[in-house]
Amino acid sequence: MVQRKDPPSEQLRAYTLLIELLSYQFAFPVRWIETQNDLIQRNNTIQRFVEVGPSNVLANMAKKTAKGQYAEEDLVRCVDRQYLSHADDAQHIYYQYDEEAPVESADNEPAQPAASSTPAAPAPVAAPPVVVQTAPQPAAQAAVAVPDVDLSAIDVVISIVAQKIRKAFDEVPAAKSIRDLSAGKSTLQNELIGQLDAEFRGLPEGSEDLALEALASHFTNFSGRPGKVMGGHIDRLVAARMPAGFNQAKIRDYLSSHWGLGLNRQTTVLCYAVTMEPAARLADAGQATQFLDSVVSRYGGKAGIALQKRAEGGASQTSAVAQVDLASLETLKKEQNEYLHKQFQLLAKHLDLDGVAQPSQTQVQGEDTDRLAEWDAEFDEEFLTGMRTIFDPRKARRYDSWWNTAREDLMALLHDIRPAAEDKASQRYQSLVNRWSPELEQMLEHSAQDDTTKEKAQMLLDDVRASGVANGPVFRYTQPAMAPETKVDANGRIQYSEVPRRQLHGENKASTLNYAQVVAARHRDVPYAHLRSRAGVDWKYDDQLTDMFLNILSTGASTGLSFTGRRVLVTGAGVGSIGADIVAGLLAGGAHVIVTTSRQPSDVAASFRQLYAKVGAPGSELIVLPFNQASKRDCEELINHIYDEQSGYGWDLDFIIPFAAISEIGRQIDKIDSKSELAHRAMLVNLLRLLGFIKQQKEKRGFDCRPTGVLLPLSPNHGNFGGDGLYSESKLGLETLFNRFHSEGWSDFLCIIGAVIGWTRGTGLMSANNIVAQGMEDSLDILTFSAPEMAFNILSLLSGDILEVADDEPIYADLSGGLQGVSDLKDKISAIRKKIVSDSRIRQALVAENLHEQKVLRGTKPAEGNVQPPLKRRSNIEPAFPPLSDYNSVTAGLQSLKGMVDLSRTVVVVGYSELGPWGSSRTRWEMEHEGRLSLEGYTELAWMMGLIKHFDGDLKGKPYTGWVDSKTKEAVDEADIEEKYGQHILGHAGIRVIEPELSEGYDPSQKEIMHEVVIDEDLPPFEAPQGVAQAFKLRHGDKVILTPIEGSESVKVVVKSGAVFMVPKAMAFNRFVAGQLPSGWDPTRYGIPEDIVAQVDPMTVYVLCCVSEAMYSAGLEDPFELYRHIHVSELANCVGTGAGGLLAMRGVYRDRYLDRPVQSDILQESFLNAMNAWTNMLLMGAAGPIKSPSGTCATSVESMDIACEAIQTLKAKVAIVGGSDDFQEEMSYEFGNMKATANAEDELEKGYLPSEMSRPTASSRSGFVESAGCGIQLVMSAELALQMGLPIYGIVAYSQMAGDKVGRSVPAPGQGVLTAARESIDAAQSPLLDVQYRKARLDEAVSEIKRWRHKESQKLIASTTSKEFKDLDAHLQHINNIAATRIRDAQWTWNNNIRHIDPTIAPMRAALATWGLSVDDIQVASFHGTSTKANDKNESNVINQQMTHLSRTVGNPLLVICQKSLTGHPKGAAGAWMFNGCLQALQTGIVPGNRNADNVDVALQQFKHLVYPSQTIHTSGIKAFMLTSFGFGQKGGLVVGIAPRYLFSTITANKFEDYRERVLQRQQKIIPVFQRRMAQGRLFQIKDQSAWTSDQEKDVFLNPQARVAQKSTGEYSFPTTVAPVASSLPARTVSDDKQLFARSSDQWLRDSISKEQGNVSVGVDIESISSVNIEDEIFLERNFTPGELKYCQGSPDKQASLSGRWAAKEAIFKSLQIPSEGAGAAMRDIEIVSNGAQPPTVLLHNRAKSAADAQKVEEVQVSITHSPESAMAIALARRRL
């Protein structure tokens, strides 16, 4: 600071400035970026920035900004800035140097200069020296010394344990044991014991159960110094996390000088610092000291001591001011600069550089600057920007898949619910007729046989055959002539619309006019649209040409205009413009069209794609190219590209329609600006250049026989409107081409048709004038046009007849509608507008007056406060359960399959879930079929991404329950979630640019790779611990020299020349787009504990989340409920993975090699089955098989196939299936090396957004896009699903895996899955495919089995004596089991698997036949569809061949779903996500389209059995789907799924209604549970222990009938005594049971009674299981004892068990032969007691016992037998003689 006359005032100003800045900082939002830019950029350069604060945060930010943005500018201006922090640079700030002693100063006295030992020379009085005053110099405050304490054993124990369990030292209680802190993880516990043993060289017995403090007390011989383990941790901390040069010595020095810690306390702090290790290496010393400060601070709190850090700059109130003579300072600077300049000259001479060339370079730069300044003065930035080139043929979008859009439109039309008559009038209908092909006719012929589509199909078929479309595509204008209509309604609102023009016939009749009639009408003796020919210098009306033109219009409105084979360039065809309608007409006529756009292709591609899909006719083609008509280079490059045969299209243009325009509204002659010049350049100058470039190309190639037709867009506006810049001049300038046609030499190459464009309503230039159009027509007798009408006019000018004339002479087409020549046009328009506005205001005033009058007459309106605010819809997030209507509705139209299907071996899906780039299956489905999120979708994703969380408590002093913002804690209304977070959600979900924080910091722009280098010079010495140094020596041998450091355990290391190092390098990797999970996704939000998340690979937590959610989808609140119905060994876990735990594998290989911290048990997490193990340990607790398939991309299908096999072979009854894989850099890099994935860099250069880069079946596809996640299904036997009352989403009818062939390419797609259609020629005629035939054969087999059962039962009963009565039940059950098994085998043989009888039938056909379906009933094919060239074609070929071989009806194509266009390719999870999507399609009847398939590859046109929808199609219902998956390594898979309604046709109405009721009850119960747990973050319910105790484990495992019971708390566990439960195998009906008992037991009872000589009485009872109401608590309490209820509660089927006991009580009562007390008498006095495997015993109480005693009954025996629908009991009462 320069010394002023009044130093105190300067100090006061500085003080005030500092206070103001700090006040501003605290009071207002931080705007540091703007502030620092202003400070750095200002003219009076600031060279010294000082930050006052606890650390150098802002100084570092400013330093980075200056280096990044102002480095070159500072270099030119020789600016050298300093960035200092008050916390770290106090000495530099106060100019305090090591050799300088602090200056003492007295209070309130100015600083005096120090006395000199020699007298100073006298100074001139008139010129006092200017002095430079330095800042006040503080007195340093020393750190307070703290008594030193030795490092204790407990410090080391806590440090080692805390480091291992990843907690800070002060978060580990010394009173807890290692076992407690390990949370039951034996591996972690074992590892800790091993480390402590290595550290202390011996541990006491049972160390894991001792408190840490007790354990530490055993180490009485502890040396007070870190041992092997602790020392290694400290060394690793310093080596891996401290900045360069910040070694142990510096750490200790800092702790001593700044905190006053002694050597031993420093060691303790280092030990504790290990437990707080930073996540990455600290950037600089400032961060390192901050880290140490935080450790010391927490250490002080733990040690109970007050630690005070030395103040860096504590100073007295005043201090001395050092003064330096300014003249001396300037002299010193001058000498330094001269010296540096001499050094520069010497170095330049030595290096052979031109050291004096700089002035000339400066001069050149100055001249360039002057030229730029002159340009800016003449034009401006807008003009320069407007001329920039944007033409890039790589960004071209090409559309030519008319064949697929026609098929797609026909399918959508047939499935549309609108009446056929309405469809006939639609543009889609007319477009289909124009795009006719044999394939469409075949599709209609097939649909005409279907009742749901018959009417539409036959009508369209008749129309097409009658119209004769064999002549090729035409553009036919079918719209009525439209007129503008402007109305002012009663409220004063101006309403504009367009209505058909009508012609009156008498008073009450009118007819709609066609457009040709309207334009042919006369106006001033000429039609509204007419042609003129040259007459001297003028253009005169030409009758002959006009008649020709009007005839062409009539033809275009009737038979149509053909443009087949024409090649046209159109510039300026935005949405709603005339150009867009011209393009539509050309495409409908079969033309090849190039359209240019000045916008990014990704912005306009959707609209052009839709345009082509609507009208693109056979042979038509649309190419969209970026192009700026204001750029000369673009004009030249565009035409060159069109004509170039090598790199371009090799076209010769038939027409050019240059309609590109730039609006200049509001610019009069005094406001002509650069935009006007730019518009003039685009609409005139460069339009002429375009024509010139075409002429050059045609002349170069000798194309002088086919002139290109030029449609000039002229205008009747010759300044009439005014205020439109140079627009009129641009249009008038084009008219010179009429004369140049003759005066210049290009008439052989170009012909001119000038079209004067009339008033066209609704276009960009004229839309503001729509409301005055009617007034103009009425008052001036002119004709205005709609955009389609004007386009029709222009398309008629492109006919061959008109062109023939134009070849010889330019044509002038007046399409102005009479507007040309109207005088005072602007005034007339203004008058009409003024009248409309006036009418509007008058009516508004009348309305206001009327309201005021009503208010006066009827009183005031109700207070606003009484008006209820509008209700806002709330989100309702719930599992998407399948709808269940009544039995007749569900089975309507289906063949009856009752009793035909073996349900025990039929696989159904009862639950599913997923986790992927679009979140859950619910949110993914919304995006997949709708392309947008609902309120529920936004809410769920906002929760999933951590943007909101649920709150229940006091918020701002008021009770509040609902969502709050996770950061601000402000309440969030669900209706506002889309507005608040919508853009963030859409930007951070789905396929997008990789976010490093979601992939462990992986940034593809800095992909790290190791590079080997050999050093050629000795490196500077560095300090390292002894052990590390010896390791260097061991690796590098004599290339490393070690030198001990006196007084230290460390050594000095010198690396000699010749040593080989691996040095990291970074490179940009071009695969930087992927489908990551939504940003902010956190497994702890689901309820997974943090220690589990830290332990396992991310892929495992994906599986845990998905399996947990799949249970809710199945209606299961607790997975243990499954064990009420199955044995724990009957649940299989078949979830697979393609690659396994990538992060865990990285730890095993890379991180371990790089000596980074890695958990010791990382190996277990890298195993493929680790996720299955964790799922079972934390959630399922099953003892069934764990099968871990790895089928690369087909893993999920292989998992499903394994599960189906397990259920069908009765090895399991329930299975968890699916797949999971992660996205990490290693696999991404290797897929890129294989060229399998899309090159994101190339894709961006082509103009594709990240979300568009996965384009299955598109002609532009270039590889798949990786993604990550998991997909899960819960499958089980249909029998079990019906028994449990679980929702059934679909039937898995068939699954198969297949290899391919001999080869050398592992990833090559194969055709092995063709074998699913393997079939002989005659097999399709097999009677086994006839349901009725199979039913007859099955009935025969079942009847035979029933006869056998009846015979055996009679034989058994007849031979059983009363003494053997107790064994009767078991023997009968055995017979029933055999019979039931034989019936199921018969069902399996005659229905489920008819290929056992005839293996020549195709597996797919046989699977469909089970349900009465054929291959024609498969409606949807979910494709693997990876977006690679090879896969998509191969997959289409395979499916098409299968359908052809199986004789699928031609004209009945499959609708193809390509899900990966939305999700990317998750490898292992792919098939599971696809399967989930298919289940959702079955449930809704919706087939989602592939929105990224902008143009389906023409190579797929040959596959007639396939349609590739790009838009969603709503069907009336889907019967069946097929899914294919192709994985690297010859893993082909196929699954066929069927709608669940076909399963319900196999059961009776009563059984279905019972099932339906239980399913609905289950759903009603689970939905609030799901929502509550989601809000509370407890979706994942971790299991702490199995359903059995350790004592029960053996009994549970060995008892096949062991089942859990539900406790009063709702939990499931095995009863204390695991008793056998009655088998659930019997399959007799009630009628069978009654018949058997009536015939068999009668004989047995007679024999028994006769044998007992009359002392036995018998009771028999049969009860329907469904008749016993187990929900009636009063009934249960009156009739059953607590013991009976407890036993029944623990049985697999509580209702069946209670029904059996009720039948037994009734039978016993009958056997006692005592008087009845009525039907309502309680039965509690009769108790049935079960004792394990023994027959039940009977206990009588109270009145029942008294009655039995009176009857001298000494013993009562009972036998209970169950069937699926009934319970039967026989009781024998034996009396005393």
UniProtKB/Swiss-Prot annotation:
Residues 110-120 have a biased composition (Low complexity). Pfam families: ACPS, adh_short, Fas_alpha_ACP, FAS_I_H, ketoacyl-synt, Ketoacyl-synt_C. GO terms for cellular component: fatty acid synthase complex. Mg(2+) binds at D1661. The modification O-(pantetheine 4'-phosphoryl)serine is found at S186. Residues 563-803 are annotated as: Ketoreductase (KR) domain. Residues 151-237 form the Carrier domain. Residues 101-124 are annotated as: Disordered. Its EC number is 2.3.1.86, 1.1.1.100, 2.3.1.41. Keywords: Fatty acid biosynthesis, Fatty acid metabolism, Lipid biosynthesis, Lipid metabolism, Magnesium, Metal-binding, Multifunctional enzyme, NADP, Oxidoreductase, Phosphopantetheine, Phosphoprotein, Transferase. InterPro entries: 4-PPantetheinyl_Trfase_dom, 4-PPantetheinyl_Trfase_dom_sf, ACPS, Acyl_Trfase/lysoPLipase, Fas_alpha_ACP, FAS_alpha_su_C, FAS_alpha_yeast, FASI_helical. Acetyl-CoA binds at residues 1661-1663, 1706-1716, 1730-1734, 1760-1762. It catalyses: acetyl-CoA + n malonyl-CoA + 2n NADPH + 4n H(+) = a long-chain-acyl-CoA + n CoA + n CO2 + 2n NADP(+); a fatty acyl-[ACP] + malonyl-[ACP] + H(+) = a 3-oxoacyl-[ACP] + holo-[ACP] + CO2; a (3R)-hydroxyacyl-[ACP] + NADP(+) = a 3-oxoacyl-[ACP] + NADPH + H(+). The active site is at C1193, H1424, H1465. Belongs to the thiolase-like superfamily. Fungal fatty acid synthetase subunit alpha family. Fatty acid synthase is composed of alpha and beta subunits. Fatty acid synthase alpha subunit; part of the gene cluster that mediates the biosynthesis of oryzines, natural products with an unusual maleidride backbone. The two subunits of the fungal fatty acid synthase oryfasA and oryfasB probably form octenoic acid. This fatty acid is most likely activated by the acyl-CoA ligase oryP to give octenyl-CoA before the citrate synthase-like protein oryE catalyzes condensation with oxaloacetate to form tricarboxylic acid. This is Fatty acid synthase subunit alpha.
